[in-house]
Amino acid sequence: MKVFITQEIPEIASTLLKAKNFDVSVYSKNKPISKKELLNNVKDADAVISLLTDKFDSDILDHMLNCKVIANYAVGFNNIDINYARQKGITVTNTPDVLTDATADLAIALTLACARRLVDGIDLVRQKKFNGWLPKLLLGVELKDKVFGILGAGRIGTATAIRAKSFGTKIIYYSNSKNEILENKTGAKKVTLEYL
């Protein structure tokens, strides 16, 4: 069985596939694969491991004569024409919860970087302009007792709110539907999009 991987991913994937005697090939250029290169590599693949940057439209799918599965190395799969893949008998999978914590961590890291003027501090040090501590130097803003707004109360929004709550923030959120888990864990209040 031939497996094509559209970009280098953690080596364990190739190792496990090769241990099962799959013929694995990996696109190894350090840039997203072009449509032409994708067409050339998927035409005889039985399976493809794709990235969110790889567009699988009807043109690409029509060239996948042997393919039975596209395993999308991403949370979503809006880069793949799912309905057309189904018509072609190609199963599409994804990794729906793999980045929830990483994304929530990054959202909090960026919030802290803004609130505490982290980039300004780094620039000051890099430019060798830091001359020692001063009471108002890069003071920034405390998160405690601030209102923290969440747009979208799915897995990532909920995980971000839980982290933000640990800084003593008041959580408000907008979502199409009420999220009782979010509300119970953080005391969050659902508001309108306009209010948020």
Residue ranges of predicted features:
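An N-terminal-biased, well-structured beta-alpha scaffold segment characteristic
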Residues: M1-T93
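Short gly/ser/thr-rich secondary-structure transition/capping motifs
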Residues: S28-P32, L51-L52, Q127-K136, N184-K190
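Residue-level detector of anion-binding/catalytic polar loops
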Residues: D23, T91, A113, K170, ...
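Structured loop/turn residues at beta-strand edges in well-structured enzyme cores
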Residues: K43, D62-L65, R116, V141, ...
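Short low-complexity, flexible loop/linker segments enriched in glycine and/or proline
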Residues: N40-V42, I108-T111, T186-K189
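Rossmann-like dinucleotide/phosphate-binding beta-alpha-beta segment
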Residues: K136-L196
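Short beta-strand elements at the ligand-binding edges of bilobed clamshell
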Residues: T91-D97, V191-L193
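Phosphate-binding beta-alpha-beta segment of Rossmann-like dinucleotide-binding domains, i.e.
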Residues: P96-V147, I162, Y173-N176
